[in-house]
Amino acid sequence: MMPAKERALRQEVIDTCLRMNALGINQGTSGNASVRVADDPAAGFFITPSAIPYEEIRPEDIVKMELDGSHSDNRRPSSEWRFHLDIMRHRPDCGAIVHTHGMFATTLACLRMEIPAFHYMIAQAGGPTIRCSGYATFGTQELSDTALEALEGRRACLLANHGMIAIGPNLKKALALALEVETLAAMYWRTLQIGKPVILPDDEIERVGAKFGTMGYGAVDKAAGNKGQAA
């Protein structure tokens, strides 16, 4: 019988995916999420299974992966398991990952545009820009490598011609940051329709980050809702 704590964590992965679709920052089976099994950075993680609608996923369907890339569950892990694995390996500060194909973040990613500090909330992502990675085919090691590069010193990035990634100490905060990035992408896109935005200087973003908590995980948790699907 599955321990209650493990079942609850697996269910939290499902609930996170349902919320990201309900919030409109993802659709269909395109996104995915993962969370560390324990606070220990050497621990494995739980990740959404591949190609199952979120509302059909049960705790038993969530896949447990080890940091060596192995998994023993019956289901196949998300097709994007490689970048989840590599982020968990290389970022001990990361406790959870949310990957979405939000409309505005993906629009900018298709233009291969980073999001500059046109608004002070950019500091939530850990620096003066939200970078856009290079392009690589989904599910490949090349995509994982370029995502890691774009996330260096950051907690979120866009994936060229693909979507976005947000990380956090837990699923609640990773999802909140993903929502913040989508909101910023929408505001930036709208600003560009009118004119050229005024970009805040790096030292102002540093000050804002310090006020958030030494560039810490300060994203307001706006994430709520349910229903949706998995990649």
Question: Which residue ranges define each predicted feature?
Answer:
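Glycine-rich flexible loops
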Residues: 1-231
